[in-house]
Amino acid sequence: KHLAGVGVAFKLAQALAAETGLPKSVVNRTLDLVGIGTIGDIVPLVDENRTLAKYGIRAINVSQRLGLVKLMEGVSLDKGAVSSENISYIIVPHLNASGRMENAGIAAGLMMGNDQEKVSQGVNKLIACNTERKKIQSDTFEICKSLVEERYKDDYFLVLDLEDAHEGITGIVAGKIKETYNKPAVIVTPTGEDCLKGTGRSIEGVNIYDL
C-alpha cells in the first residue's frame, strides 16, 4: 500500500509482461528509473518499496542509460558508488529542477535519449535549472522568514502571501518554514485570474485539510 506511483507503474508493467510473454529482462531495464522514483517520492522504504529501492540502486550503479550516466558525470557522482543519499540529494533535485523551473520534458527526454549531443545539452540544462532553482528557493525562503519575523511570529498557523514567488519552489519553501518555526505553513501566490493558489506543509499531529 506504500508504493510510489513509479512502483505501481512497474507492477503493472510486470503484470502485462507476464500476460503477454514479454521477457522479465525487458521490464527490469527500467529498475534504475524505478529506484530513482521510489527514493525521490519519499515513500516509506518498507516491504516492496525497500526491495525496489535496493535493486534500483544496483541498477543505477551499472546503468547503461546514456542520460543517467552523463548526468552522474555532470554532477560528479562516481558510477558504481551511488547511494540512496546521492539519489535523494543530487540526482532527484536535478531531475525535478526542469519541471520546477521550466519543463519536465527536459528530464524525461534526457532519460530516454540516445543522442550524445542532445544528452549533453540536456544535462547542462538540468544543472542550470537546478542552480537557478536553488538561488530562487534561497531568496524566497529569506523573504518568508522576514515576513514571519516582522508580522506573524506569534501566529500558530503561518499563511504567507507572496506576489512574485515562483510556484515551482513554494512547496519546498513552505516545508523549510514549517521546519524552522515548527508550525503549519502555507504559501499563496496569485494565479492571474483573481484567485490565489496555495501550497502547504504541516507539522505532526495537525491535519492541514481539517483546518
PLM features: what roles do these ranges have?
Residues 1-8, 18, 25-26:
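Hydrophobic, small-residue-rich alpha-helical packing segments that form membrane-like cores
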Residues 4-11, 172, 176:
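Short amphipathic alpha-helical face segments that pack within enzyme cores
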Residues 17-211:
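Hydrophobic helix-and-loop "lid/oligomerization" segment in the mid-to-C-terminal part
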Residues 12-16:
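Alpha-helical scaffold elements that line and support the substrate/ligand-binding pocket
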